[in-house]
Structure formats: structure tokens, C-alpha cells
Amino acid sequence: MSVSVCPCGTGNLLDACCGHYHAGTPAPDAQSLMRSRYSAYVLGLVDYLVGTTLPAQQPGLDRAGMAAWSAQSTWLGLEVESAEVFGGQPEHAFVTFTARWHDTDGDHQHRERSAFVQHAGRWYFIDPTVPLNAGRNDPCPCASGQKFKKCCASYLGS
């Protein structure tokens, strides 16, 4: 059992916070998933980062790059500004946050409004660096069973 403080910034112990998501318990909402992903970067849990990215995007992820960035950075903190559902659809959400880290080039911060989708009881991060190859009439990449235009197209600005 770990007694370390969770890196996500809540002040809770890792095992009582993001640690149980890393162990397989689904995150209950988009903000919890985002916090657990930040903690996964701090802890070098690349498999977790891949597994919590939209399944349609997972083959396009740069696992080696993720691992290198995680290992070569000293993570300085996370601030969550907001978490909101999109258009009243509880399975679509945005989380706005700022992450700070230090590497050989100095101190950095990154502010992002990340998109998340829930499918089959699990939340997934939609990675803006990996293309979603879906036409408007194609099945939605989130696996909802709906056409892209009726599901995530408006949410993702497509």
C-alpha cells in the first residue's frame, strides 16, 4: 500500500485518489480521468495513458514519446480550471487545466481544454494530436453506434 500523496493536486493519498483508477477502477467523470492521466505521466504509467485514450486513436499514439516525456520531466503541478458537460450530454465533457513541468529546456506550462467521451461505463480522452478518421456519415469513433454527425462531430468541431 502506498502512502504517498497523489500527484494530481487534490492532496489525497495516491491509493485513495488516482491510484485505484490506475489499478483498473473506471474514473467516475472526465475530471477524475484527466487528473489520473496527469498522475500517470508523473508515475510513468504509459499503458494507462494509452488505455484511457479513445480506442480508435490508440494505434496512432507515440508510446515511446510518451514514455520519454514522462521520464525526462519533473512534474510541478496541475491546476484544474473547469469541468463541464457538452450540450447537456453527460457522455461528452471538457476539462480545462494547466499542467506545469521542468525539463532540460527549463520550466514549462501547458493550458488545454481537453475533450472526453464516455462509452460503456468508461471515460476516454480524445487526443487532439491523433486524427479521428471519420466522415460525417461514418460510425462515430467513440463506438456509440451512432453516425459521427449525430454524435461527436459537433462536440469536436468537425
UniProtKB/Swiss-Prot annotation:
Taxonomic superkingdom: Bacteria
Pfam name, any one: YchJ_M-like
Record-annotated membrane-spanning stretches: none
Coiled coil location: none
Family: Belongs to the UPF0225 family.
HAMAP family: UPF0225 (MF_00612)
Protein name according to UniProt: UPF0225 protein PSEEN1229
Organism: Pseudomonas entomophila (strain L48)
Organism lineage string: Bacteria, Pseudomonadati, Pseudomonadota, Gammaproteobacteria, Pseudomonadales
